[in-house]
Amino acid sequence: MKSSATVPTAHAGRYMVQLCKHFGHKVPAEWNDHEGKITFEMGEAALRAAPETLMMVARAGDPDSLARLEKVMDSHLKRFAFREPDMAVEWRRGA
């Protein structure tokens, strides 16, 4: 199962690196200046930073795991983006 979210932000690269570094202390994570991948027990998150957009793709084996992965990515991104309180992360299933 797969879902994706495209988040408008001028700080996509910074947030992508923060997410990868943060989770990299607990689970396997790799990244470069534009892309990252985090491998959780419940699935995998792929990230891509563009100049004005952070794209996230979540993959998991079942709906419950996918929902957990979306929630984890959403909550941590919003924590790092606290200066953007109106940030909306809308996941699209199957996208």
Predicted features by range, described:
Residues 1, 46, 93-95:
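Eukaryotic, polar/proline-rich low-complexity intrinsically disordered regions
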Residues 1-10, 15-18:
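Short glycine-/aliphatic-rich beta-strand segments at the starts of folded cytosolic domains
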Residues 2, 33-37, 51-55:
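A generic structural signal for beta-strand entry/edge sites
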Residues 8-11, 30-32, 48, 71, ...:
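Charged, terminal alpha-helix-loop-beta segments
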Residues 25-42:
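Ser/Thr-rich, low-complexity intrinsically disordered terminal regions
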Residues 41, 45-60:
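Beta-strand/loop substructures that line and gate deep hydrophobic ligand-binding cavities in soluble
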Residues 58-95:
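C-terminal structural segments of small proteins and small subunits
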